[in-house]
Amino acid sequence: MSGVHDVLVVGAGPTGLACGIEAARAGLSLLIVEKGCLVNSLFTYPPGMTFFTSRERLEIGELPLPSVNVKPTRAEALEYYRRVAETYRLPIHYQERVITVEAPNGIFRVGVEDAHSRPKNYTARRVIIATGYYDIPNLLNIPGEDLPKVSHYYTEAHAFYQRKVAVIGGANSAAVAALDLWRHGAEVTLIHREPELSRHIKYWIKPDLENRIKENSIRALFETEVKEIHQDWICVQRKTGEVLRVANDFVFALTGYRPDFEFLEGAGVQVDSQTRRPACNPETLESNVPGLYLAGVIIAGMDTNEIFIENGRFHGKQIIADISRKVQEEVQAGTLAAPAL
């Protein structure tokens, strides 16, 4: 069938690239579609960021990640994944957002829009969704959240020197941002609705933040929720019911992110109403939609602390092993021509 790919991967992050590598190794015709740039989520990380994990755990395709540090930097990771894509000659279409995934006659029709909102369609026998979770922040849903002074993504600290900055959240992203802002001369207030910092904060970061809070270098408001955001101040409420008005120039609402469950449901994937975990065979990672596979953090639902690059990078082997087996069965049954090796 002309123009039909054996495998179409949605997402060119590390997990999507790992899936593409395995498909290419299996001799399957492949297309990867990415809404942004290569490893788009990693590109949006703060420029000076260092990963929490070792370089070996970021490696895919048996290619080593060279780094002068035990934990690689953002710049080193971006260079590495460019080399991966080039080494394996992965066919990637950038700036194409997948809008629909349908299989009306057993062949998937994938509808996309390019950077200029022009529609186009691709067809594939199997689809792998590896879209991650970094695109959709967990919103506060409060007045003023849409003000220009509010961001759900931390960038870098210099612009906030001698400014009053609120960091909302109590996990790794909030901890790193609060410390970085303070070290670059910002007046930082950390606001967290829980009574203490998250236990998931990395062991070398948490004591640093706790000490800065203890010495009052960083103001911390625990068991506190932001109720309103205004141009020059924010309104917060303590667990006791006390309402405070905190002077403020900028807000980083680092309250986590979630996968695009609506996109999955639009593709026919069943999503649990409580855990938001999509229906997925744990052995093959095939969803309830035949031929539609899920890879990476999206299979964990709301529990985004369960899967990271270091374990999601192995999903491609599981998925392509199942696809290859089914392709061979179809070839033997005479229902599919053998893939061109």
PLM segments and residue spans:
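Rossmann-like dinucleotide/flavin-binding elements
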Residues: S2-H5, V9-K35, Y153-S198, E283-V331
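A Rossmann-like FAD-binding core segment of flavoenzymes
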Residues: T87-D114, N121-A124, R183-T275, V331-L341
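A non-catalytic, amphipathic alpha-helix used as a structural packing/dimerization or gating element
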Residues: E79, N211, F314-Q318
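Short, glycine/charged-enriched secondary-structure capping and boundary segments
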Residues: A23, Y45-M49, I107, N141-E145, ...
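Beta1-alpha1 glycine-rich phosphate/pyrophosphate-binding loop at the start
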Residues: H5, A12-L90, A175-W204, D272-Q274
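FAD-binding core/adjacent interface of flavoenzyme oxidoreductases
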Residues: M1-V10, R25, N40, T44, ...
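Short glycine-/acidic-enriched loop or helix-start segments at secondary-structure transitions
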Residues: C19, L42, A103, N138-L140, ...
